[in-house]
Amino acid sequence: MDQNEIETLQYYLKEYGQQAEVFAGQLELMENGRMEALAAIEALEALATSEDGTVLLQIGGGASLRAKVLEPEKVLLNIGSEVIVEKTSVDAIEYLKDRITELEASQKKVSEALEKLRAQTNEIAKRLEQGYRQAPGGSPVPHRHDHEDHDEE
């Protein structure tokens, strides 16, 4: 394996690593969205069983207020692109359940893509290791001429 092939493999290894980070970030965002939807469903269901419509409203910093929901049957939902629609509590719960199903399907696809990417990354790493062993001197570091500025002030 020549130096150019080693450098090409190193480039692909770096690129695949960056893609894996993007996929992992997407998975995290999807999981956060799924958890928020589950929490919203739980809150709507609890509100439906509340006798007087009083809820704890978190206002940040660990502080909460007791608040009375004036219209517990009317839920405002952000459906994307800053579009807000009003739905009944039951319809909102159904919408959120559908959103969870979509998120889970997307998570599965991204997880599968991430697994394929990791398999390719492992294969490239193996090929690089072979290349390093075959390279003169067995050095895993490509020969670069880095200029250090130790003498400049």
From Swiss-Prot:
Pfam family, one: Prefoldin
Basic and acidic residues biased stretches: 143-153
UniProt keyword Chaperone present: yes
SUPFAM superfamilies the UniProt entry points to: Prefoldin
UniProt-listed InterPro entries: PFD_alpha_archaea, Prefoldin, Prefoldin_subunit_alpha
Cellular localization per UniProt: Cytoplasm
GO CC annotations on file: cytoplasm; prefoldin complex
The entry's keywords: Chaperone, Cytoplasm
Gene3D superfamilies, alphabetized: 1.10.287.370
Region (Disordered): 126-153
GO molecular function: unfolded protein binding
GO biological process: protein folding
UniProt key word Cell wall biogenesis/degradation: no
Subunit annotation: Heterohexamer of two alpha and four beta subunits.
Family: Belongs to the prefoldin alpha subunit family.
Its biological purpose: Molecular chaperone capable of stabilizing a range of proteins. Seems to fulfill an ATP-independent, HSP70-like function in archaeal de novo protein folding.
Name of the featured protein: Prefoldin subunit alpha
